[in-house]
């Protein structure tokens, strides 16, 4: 097939390479494969060569084996035994390789001539038979099963036969080529075929491998030669057929062309004869236009004829330049010019001959003349006037213009008058002669013979006389015509050629012996030819018209034609008959003249003799006439045979031409087919290339998509890591806020106690101190649960509100029952900016509100003493009315929060004194510093035992359009707070104190056991989930931290109400806490929100993954107060240690996961990580700069961790005054206190529950530390509100130098609302688009823009 040509060429080239390497078996297989694909040139020779070399190699190997065996036999017995074993092994293997049946089947396939015989099928077989037979033979002849020689070739032959016969088109073509007709086979052939199948070889000769191979090879060669001969014969036959068809077609085309040419010539001649053209004379402008026929006009334009004008009798002609084909019109003056002229074209400039043509057309005579030829001698000179042309004059033309007038050449030519009269006379004479002959015959029958002879002689004489008279009359008439027809003579005699045929000379007889010179006759009605004395000229018939004759104008230099070139057989026979008739007439005339002369001389006696002599002469004449007739017949017959022979030759030539044409057409058709196949193949290649290009483009696009997806995944992972860090910070902040609330509760209780103590001191100063001691002892005797034991994550996180860093105005709270009342407040944004109060007067006394900040500049070290108002007042912003209302929160959902605090009565007394005497406080504080510092160790050691019961505040937030509303339960009055900046804060704090009822110890132990079981189950589930996640992340190389899952799966607080005002039924609370029951309600009154709380637990020691588990451990409620008295601290320590160990393990796992993830990112995107590292370096530099700036800006530079005593806080407050000595003392005291705080931190970690906080979660920019402190610590924090800085919320950028500080974390807040659960999240970016700078307040009364 044509499509497999390239593969065949490749196989051929590979076979040649293996042939050069002397690997003949492989080369032979490749050659056969290439031939099967497409029979290329020279493939058969290569196959035969490879087979020959393979046979030689096999024979050489056999000879070598035989020689080796002989040598081994002669060497001795020892060497003979292994050789015999080898020979037997080889023979055994050779015998076992193939059987006789296998060899016979392969030989039968190779010996078969047709594909039908190869498959042992009939010609009329079906496709099913072909497939069945092919499968059966393929199993027998497959090279893996049949090891006989040439089995592989036989298998290939079967395969080729199956491919051809299974395809219907190829099968038909094969049948046509090999002339296989599907006819029913004879019984004899079938019997032979069956015998061959049963017994393929009749003789009992055993074939060896070599003989079988040689026979098969010779048979194959013979078969190939036969096929080649058949192909050559078919090709030759096709070529001959094509040549015959081409010759026939060419002959047919030539005949059609000749016919078309003849028709065109006739049409042109008719058009030329029927048209006339007017020509202007260039010799004189006064000459009228010359009317000329189309033929003459064409000759005139070509330059073959010059026209002689009628009026001026001057010539004009056209001359052409041979080089540039430019035409020049010459007048009569150029006759005298002898030299040539130059061409006037600028590109030519060659000489142009000025010679006039040899032919002249006379307008008057309307005839053409030959210049330079002699006139005949018989022509007399011209005398008289030249007759006018046949055209009517111009005057008569105008009159006769209306009448149609035919051209002259189209009118039938009439005989002249004298010829008509002559013909009438001849007819009359003939009639008279006939009458006389009839009379003579009648007389001869009655008279004697002499009378008959006389009558005959008289009759002959009369006929001779009439013939002579007729000839004389014709000559006289012609002479008169010749006198009438004028001749023009110039320097040389010119012959006149007339249009009328009657004027041609015909007086001379064909038997005239006078010598005549040949002359050229040129006329529009006759073809030119030369006349000689042997040639005859016939007169035209009267009815012959010039229109029917051929008009061929030729130049004078053209050679004349012979009669054989222009006359046919019929014309020659007619001429011969005329010549014979003339001869008879002449003979009769001669005989009659002689007889008359004799009769005059002799006597009439001898009349009989004369008659006999006349008879003899007549007989001779008859014989001669018959001889001439016979001669003419023979000549006609020979000519007819010659004509037929020529026709046959022409017919054969036409056939050959048609064959050649058909051959050429066939070649062209084959070329076109090959060209179309080539185009189709190129198109297929182009389509394949396009498909490959599309696949490549798709692959590239997929790779790009994968790369982009991978980059996006990496970016998303980085973003997730950043989010996780932010979430951890947020959780830390939330814990800090909760501790703030707890500290605020402690502060409120202490504040109430201080009020009671002040009232008692006024009544009885001596008894007040003792009463306070008794109260403290009672509180110590009733131990409470520590704050760290309760899970902080049960309650929702508080947003990073600026309320914790800014002053709050609270309205007077009206309480009917201090144990059951609920106080609430709201913080709202003011639409209009209001004047910010001075640092010393943020909360005025006229509004009856207590402030959490320090007092004015005059009394900077005083402690705030809020007074409880009797009547509530509401501060409302009219510009921002409230839109939403909060529903009441059920008391069942409120949980107690138990905090550990250190109570020091001495510190309280000092604080009270500081409020009264501002000036004396400096000295008192200095004196008390040493005393209080000595008591630090004792106070710190008693932290674990001194427990105080406080109630945790339940917070809920709602926001929409930067506004918030809340209602107090008993009074239903709204309270607002005003801020100096434009930040949005919406918060509602519902503080409700509950008298907790504690259950028995046994119930708590049962609950604790169940909780431990649940923890173990949860840990197992978490481990299983981690394994599944690690298996999933192996393919994708992406790991999501567990912190995000646990944080995202944490349920909302049950007290938070949805935006659709739906009450929360506490389902999550009941599910998360095992065996939780409704808690008894206890009430207490709180009036303030604390700014910060001190912390002692570091984030590095606690892992956030176990935070929820810890929360579940301590989410149950308690009913009995006696339980806490007997609660052992040892059990708590063990439980905490176990939790810490588990947390540390999970922390290590998280670190390992993060490290592995970071390594993958570093490997895959090293370039991006380097850029990020550079950015981080720049950020670290900026952080260092920010820290330095913060240290400079802060008024105090002392930072303390852990439990800070009252002395530390008082010292910090005294730093604001101008006391240099105090600052030195404070620094020393702080250093001592730091050591004690470290010890307290260690003790608290052992005795308290782990809380997820940072080392310094809520550190102020002024340097004051936050943590679990005493009551006075909270007061000091409230005093330090004037030193709080506010930042630009629109930018939302965290100060990188103060990540560990509280206000650096609490820069800006973004509260997000999530459907009904209303999860509150804190982020470091604000949604506000406006950039606003906020003022910074200091105690030195300086205002600066940050």
Curated annotation (Swiss-Prot):
Polar residues compositional bias, start-end: 508-517, 552-566, 812-824, 863-882, 1068-1089, 1244-1259, 1336-1346
Coiled coil: 214-275, 577-742, 999-1034, 1131-1194
Alphabetical list of Gene3D superfamilies matching this protein: DnaJ domain
SUPFAM superfamilies noted in UniProt: Chaperone J-domain
GO molecular function, one term: Hsp70 protein binding
GO cellular component terms, semicolon-separated: endoplasmic reticulum membrane
Pfam families: DnaJ
Feature: compositional bias, Basic and acidic residues: 746-755, 1173-1190
Extent of Low complexity compositional bias: 221-234, 403-485, 526-551, 756-782, 843-862, 899-947, 1195-1243, 1263-1279
Compositionally biased residues, Acidic residues: 1289-1301
Gene Ontology annotations of biological process type: cellular response to misfolded protein; chaperone cofactor-dependent protein refolding
Keywords: Coiled coil
Region listing for Disordered, in residue ranges: 57-92, 214-239, 371-570, 746-949, 1026-1090, 1173-1301, 1319-1346
Protein name: J domain-containing protein DDB_G0295729
């Amino acid at each position: 097939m044509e499509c497999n040509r390239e593969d065949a060429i490749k196989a051929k080239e590979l076979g040649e390479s293996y042939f050069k390497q002397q690997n003949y078996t492989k080369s032979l297989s490749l050659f056969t494969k290439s031939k099967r694909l497409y029979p290329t040139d020279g493939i058969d020779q290569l196959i035969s060569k490879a087979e020959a070399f393979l046979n030689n190699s096999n024979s050489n190997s056999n000879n070598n084996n035989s020689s080796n065996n002989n040598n081994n036999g002669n060497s001795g017995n020892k060497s003979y035994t292994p050789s015999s074993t080898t020979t037997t092994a080889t023979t055994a293997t050779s015998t076992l390789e193939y059987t006789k049946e296998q060899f016979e089947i392969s030989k039968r396939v190779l010996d078969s001539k047709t594909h039908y015989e190869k498959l042992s099928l009939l010609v009329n077989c079906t496709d099913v038979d072909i497939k069945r037979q092919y499968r059966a033979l393929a199993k027998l002849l497959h090279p893996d099963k049949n090891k006989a020689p040439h089995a592989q070739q036989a298998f290939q032959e079967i395969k080729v036969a199956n491919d051809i016969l299974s395809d219907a088109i190829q099968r038909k073509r094969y049948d046509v080529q090999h002339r296989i007709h599907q006819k029913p086979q004879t019984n004899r052939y079938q019997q032979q075929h069956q015998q061959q199948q049963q017994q393929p070889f009749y003789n009992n000769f055993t074939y060896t491998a070599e003989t079988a191979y040689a026979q098969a090879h010779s048979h194959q060669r013979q078969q190939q030669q036969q096929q080649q001969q058949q192909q050559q014969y078919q090709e030759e036959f096709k070529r001959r057929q094509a040549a015959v068809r081409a010759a026939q077609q060419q002959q047919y085309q030539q005949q059609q062309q000749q016919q078309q040419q003849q028709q065109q010539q006739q049409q042109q001649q008719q058009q030329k004869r029927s048209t006339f053209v007017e020509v202007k004379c260039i010799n004189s402008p006064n000459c009228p236009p010359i009317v000329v026929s189309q033929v003459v006009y064409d000759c005139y334009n070509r330059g073959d004829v010059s026209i002689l004008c009628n009026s001026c009798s001057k010539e004009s002609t056209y001359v052409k330049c041979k080089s540039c084909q430019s035409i020049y019109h010459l007048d009569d003056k150029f006759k005298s010019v002898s030299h040539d002229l130059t061409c006037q074209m600028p590109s030519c400039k060659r000489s142009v001959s000025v010679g006039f043509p040899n032919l002249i057309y006379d307008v008057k005579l309307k005839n053409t003349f030959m210049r330079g030829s002699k006139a005949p001698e018989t022509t007399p000179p011209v005398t008289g006037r030249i007759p006018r042309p046949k055209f009517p004059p111009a005057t008569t033309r105008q009159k006769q213009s209306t009448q149609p007038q035919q051209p002259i050449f189209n009118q039938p030519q009439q005989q002249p008058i004298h010829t008509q009269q002559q013909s009438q006379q001849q007819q009359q004479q003939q009639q008279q002669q006939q009458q006389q002959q009839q009379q003579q015959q009648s007389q001869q029958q009655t008279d004697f013979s002499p009378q008959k002879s006389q009558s005959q002689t008289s009759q002959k004489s009369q006929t001779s006389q009439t013939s002579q008279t007729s000839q004389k009359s014709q000559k006289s008439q012609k002479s008169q015509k010749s006198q009438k027809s004028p001749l023009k003579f110039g320097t040389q005699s010119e012959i006149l050629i007339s249009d009328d045929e009657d004027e041609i000379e015909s007086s001379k007889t064909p038997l005239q012996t006078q010598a005549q010179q040949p002359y050229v006759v040129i006329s529009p009605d006759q073809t030119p030819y030369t006349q000689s004395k042997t040639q005859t000229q016939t007169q035209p018939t009267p009815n012959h018209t010039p229109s029917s004759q051929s008009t061929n104008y030729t130049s004078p230099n053209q050679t004349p034609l012979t009669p054989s070139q222009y006359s046919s057989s019929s014309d020659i026979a007619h001429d011969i008959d005329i010549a014979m008739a003339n001869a008879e007439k002449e003979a009769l005339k001669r005989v009659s003249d002689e007889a008359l002369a004799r009769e005059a001389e002799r006597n009439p006696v001898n009349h009989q003799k004369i008659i006999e002599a006349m008879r003899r002469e007549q007989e001779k004449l008859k014989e001669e006439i018959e001889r001439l007739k016979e001669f003419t017949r023979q000549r006609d017959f020979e000519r007819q045979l010659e004509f037929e022979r020529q026709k046959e030759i022409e017919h054969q030539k036409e056939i050959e031409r048609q064959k050649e044409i058909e051959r050429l057409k066939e070649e062209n058709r084959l070329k076109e087919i090959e060209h179309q196949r080539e185009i189709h193949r190129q198109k297929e290649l182009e389509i394949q290339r396009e498909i490959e290009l599309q696949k490549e483009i798709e692959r590239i696009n997929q790779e790009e998509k994968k790369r982009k997806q991978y980059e996006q995944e990496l970016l998303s992972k980085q973003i997730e890591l950043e989010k996780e860090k932010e979430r951890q910070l947020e959780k830390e902040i939330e814990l800090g806020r909760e501790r703030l609330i707890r500290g605020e509760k402690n502060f409120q209780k202490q504040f109430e106690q201080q009020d009671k103590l002040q009232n008692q001191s006024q009544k009885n100063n001596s008894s007040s101190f003792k009463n306070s001691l008794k109260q403290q002892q009672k509180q110590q005797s009733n131990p409470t649960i520590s704050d760290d034991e309760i899970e902080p994550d049960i309650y929702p996180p508080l947003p990073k509100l600026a309320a914790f860093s800014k002053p709050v105005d609270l309205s007077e709270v009206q309480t009917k029952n201090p144990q059951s009342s609920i106080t609430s407040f709201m913080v709202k944004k003011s639409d209009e900016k209001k004047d910010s109060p001075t640092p010393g007067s943020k909360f005025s006394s006229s509004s009856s509100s207590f402030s959490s900040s320090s007092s004015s500049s005059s009394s900077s070290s005083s402690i705030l003493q809020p007074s409880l108002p009797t009547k509530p007042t509401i501060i409302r912003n009219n510009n921002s009315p409230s839109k939403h209302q909060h529903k009441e929160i059920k008391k069942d959902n409120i949980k107690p929060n138990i905090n550990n605090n250190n109570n020091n009565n001495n510190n309280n007394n000092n604080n009270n004194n500081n409020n009264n005497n501002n000036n004396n406080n400096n000295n008192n504080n200095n004196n008390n510093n040493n005393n209080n510092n000595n008591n630090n160790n004792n106070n710190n050691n008693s932290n674990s035992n001194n427990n105080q019961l406080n109630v945790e505040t339940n917070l809920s937030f709602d926001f929409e359009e930067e506004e918030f509303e809340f209602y107090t339960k008993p009074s239903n009055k709204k309270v607002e707070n005003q801020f100096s900046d434009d930040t949005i804060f919406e918060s509602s704090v519902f503080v409700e104190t509950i008298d907790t009822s504690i259950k028995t110890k046994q119930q708590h132990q049962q609950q604790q056991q169940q909780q431990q079981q649940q923890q173990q189950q949860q840990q197992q589930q978490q481990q299983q989930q981690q394994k599944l996640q690690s298996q999933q992340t192996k393919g994708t190389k992406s790991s999501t931290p567990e912190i995000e899952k646990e944080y995202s799966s944490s349920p909302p607080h049950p007290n938070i109400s949805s935006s659709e005002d739906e009450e929360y039924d506490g389902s999550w609370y009941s599910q998360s806490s095992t065996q939780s029951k409704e808690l008894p309600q206890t009430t207490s009154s709180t009036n303030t929100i604390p700014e910060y709380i001190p912390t002692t637990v570091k984030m590095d020691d606690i892992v956030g993954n176990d935070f929820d588990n810890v929360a579940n451990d301590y989410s149950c409620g308690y009913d009995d107060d006696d339980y806490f008295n007997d609660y052992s601290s040892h059990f708590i320590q063990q439980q905490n240690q176990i939790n810490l160990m588990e947390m540390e393990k999970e922390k290590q796992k998280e670190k390992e996961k993060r490290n592995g993830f970071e390594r993958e990112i570093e490997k895959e995107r090293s370039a991006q990580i380097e850029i990020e590292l550079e950015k981080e370096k720049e950020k670290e530099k900026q952080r260092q700069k920010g820290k330095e700036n913060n240290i400079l800006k802060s008024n105090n530079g002392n930072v303390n961790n852990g439990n800070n005593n009252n002395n530390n806080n008082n010292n910090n407050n005294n730093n604001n005054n101008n006391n240099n000595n105090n600052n030195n003392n404070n620094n020393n005291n702080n250093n001592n206190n730091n050591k004690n705080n470290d010890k307290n931190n260690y003790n608290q970690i052992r005795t308290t529950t782990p809380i997820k906080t940072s080392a310094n979660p809520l550190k102020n920019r002024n340097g004051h530390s936050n943590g679990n402190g005493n009551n006075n610590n909270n007061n000091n924090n409230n005093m330090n509100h004037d030193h709080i800085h506010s930042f630009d919320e629109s930018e939302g950028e965290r100060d990188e130098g103060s990540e560990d500080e509280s206000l650096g974390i609490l820069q800006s807040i973004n509260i997000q609302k999530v459907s009904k659960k209303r999860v509150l999240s804190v982020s470091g970016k604000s949604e506000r688009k406006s950039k606003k700078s906020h003022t910074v307040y200091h105690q030195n009364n300086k205002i600066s823009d940050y």
